[in-house]
């Protein structure tokens, strides 16, 4: 979200974010409640982070609805989760996640423009466009190795983590609110 920090479009007003894929497996930990399964705690975090990072705020209100089209597979956990977030600034986000639907996008509408990313999470890079005609292309190579190297450098050199554990805690607070 380095792009969002530098945008001339004003404040985020409306966000639409989705992360999901079709998972045909029928016996996997992601379908087991005791093991932390469910789309929200896995792919839903990507949709959630898109909204959180676009606004720079933590949500103050959550409304959610889960559904399952394959109850024979997803009888303990949700296959799909739709959730709406409200932020202190008044910005609203409509987020979706699923193990039954392929989706991978983020659109942020600002006071004076928009940003679209599709895909907004991918191992091979993220692409998008802005209302001013700017094209966004962030190629990624082996991002997990890069993050592990940066984490090790932070520990060895007493520098702040690029993605500190507190970010995960913020995500989990919202994930838990979605499930309530």
Show where each model-derived region lies.
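Predominantly a Rossmann-like dinucleotide-binding segment in NAD(P)-dependent oxidoreductases
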Residues: 1-73
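Mobile beta-alpha loop/short-helix "lid" or hinge segments that flank ligand
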Residues: 16-25, 121-126, 141
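Active-site donor-binding loop signature of nucleotide-sugar glycosyltransferases
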Residues: 17-19, 64, 97, 119, ...
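Short, basic/glycine-rich phosphate-binding loops at helix/coil junctions
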Residues: 28-29, 127-131
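A short glycine-threonine-serine/GTX helix/turn-capping micro-motif
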Residues: 35-42, 134-142
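Contiguous beta-strand/loop segments that form the cofactor/metal-binding neighborhood of enzyme cores
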Residues: 42, 48-124, 145-159
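C-terminal helix-rich "cap/oligomerization" subdomain common to oxidoreductases
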Residues: 136, 151-180
